[in-house]
């Protein structure tokens, strides 16, 4: 396992694991209580995490197919996306998740996901009160019914800015983690995302 966190800031973390048990322990703070490797071979996993208060980013990667179960925070609304060139590389609650889907935002549903080999899973958690306040200010009517669908399939052009944003965050995690520890950069990221 390696850790890149030169300033000791607990709000930004980047770790690599070559052991599933250590990876499983590291994702427990994400309320994932079970993580099982489904494909044979050596395990390599990466966790990148940044907590900016009302906004949290998590990037998970593993070189093997895995299944995760757990519970979600009742205080946050989460949005997840998978990054992989193939159309379908994840299953959540028994339903295929495509590369043009946002999923996992119903806080009343537990975590139940299977991801294939070499899939990048990027999650954003927004404080529920802040999320609904911003949604209302922006004129969005996100009813309980919409949120309980737990997945939205979006047109690729509609999703392009969010995918690009997630790719940039993931790139910064992997190449310049120390930038995420700077308050000015955190403010810029929060403004851009929200």
Model-derived segments and spans:
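Well-ordered mid-protein domain cores that form the structural environment of catalytic cofactors
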Residues: 57-58, 64-111
């Amino acid at each position: 396992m390696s850790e890149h966190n030169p300033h000791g800031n607990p709000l930004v973390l980047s770790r690599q694991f070559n052991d599933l048990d250590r990876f499983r322990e590291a994702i427990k703070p994400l309320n994932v209580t079970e993580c099982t490797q489904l494909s044979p071979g050596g395990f390599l996993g990466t966790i990148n995490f940044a907590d900016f208060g009302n906004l949290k980013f998590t990037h998970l990667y593993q070189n093997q197919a895995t299944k995760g179960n757990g519970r979600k925070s009742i205080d946050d609304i989460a949005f997840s996306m998978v990054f992989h060139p193939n159309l379908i590389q994840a299953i959540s609650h028994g339903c295929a998740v495509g590369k043009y889907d946002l999923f996992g935002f119903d806080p009343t549903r537990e975590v139940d996901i299977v991801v294939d080999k070499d899939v990048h899973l990027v999650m954003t958690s927004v404080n529920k009160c802040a999320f609904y306040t911003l949604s209302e200010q922006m004129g969005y009517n996100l009813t309980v019914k919409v949120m309980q669908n737990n997945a939205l399939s979006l047109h690729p052009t509609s999703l392009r800015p969010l995918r690009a944003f997630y790719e940039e965050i993931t790139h910064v995690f992997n190449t310049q983690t120390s930038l995420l520890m700077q308050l000015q950069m955190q403010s810029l990221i929060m403004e851009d995302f929200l």
